[in-house]
From Swiss-Prot:
Pfam family, one: Ribosomal_S16
Homology family: Belongs to the bacterial ribosomal protein bS16 family.
Molecular function GO terms recorded: structural constituent of ribosome
Basic and acidic residues bias locations: 87-117
UniProt entry tagged with the keyword Ribonucleoprotein: yes
Protein name: Small ribosomal subunit protein bS16
Record-linked PANTHER family: 30S RIBOSOMAL PROTEIN S16 (PTHR12919), SMALL RIBOSOMAL SUBUNIT PROTEIN BS16M (PTHR12919:SF20)
GO BP, sorted A to Z: translation
SUPFAM superfamilies: Ribosomal protein S16
Domain of life: Bacteria
């Protein structure tokens, strides 16, 4: 299977990446089939060979997550919601709902406690005024 991935090069702590097409079983910095672009995360510079990328994608090459995000930013791929993101979003919605319920319960409990304290204070005041 052909993968579109980032190949690291540059100095230590000054990494840049080449976007390459390579066999999925080859090493990260091994010899690629084709170089398709360049990405520098420090300067946010990106150069993509759009024709070659479209050709590789039409042939069935699978981009890695990092490459997919670069291609989405470059407009070569439509932004897709992956199943993991859907699961994360649904869990977040469930958490928000449960937090809202618990906060509502806590508010009610606090109000009831405050009302009970007021009733107890008024009873003690009445008892002290009668005595």
């Amino acid at each position: 299977m052909i993968k579109l991935r980032l190949k690291r090069f540059g100095k230590k702590r000054e990494a840049s990446f080449r976007l390459v097409a390579c066999n999925s079983t080859s090493r990260r910095d091994g010899r690629p089939l084709q170089e398709l672009g360049f990405y520098n995360p420090r300067t946010k510079e990106t150069r993509l060979d759009t024709e070659a990328l479209r050709l590789r994608l039409s042939q069935g090459a699978q981009p890695t997550d990092a490459v997919r995000s670069l291609l989405e930013k470059g407009g070569l791929l439509e932004k897709t919601i992956r199943p993991a993101e859907l699961i994360g979003k649904s869990k977040q919605e469930e958490l928000r709902k449960s937090e809202a319920k618990t906060s509502a319960k806590n508010k009610k409990a606090n109000e009831e406690k405050a009302n009970e304290e007021k009733v107890e204070e008024s009873e003690t005041l009445e008892a002290s005024s009668e005595a």
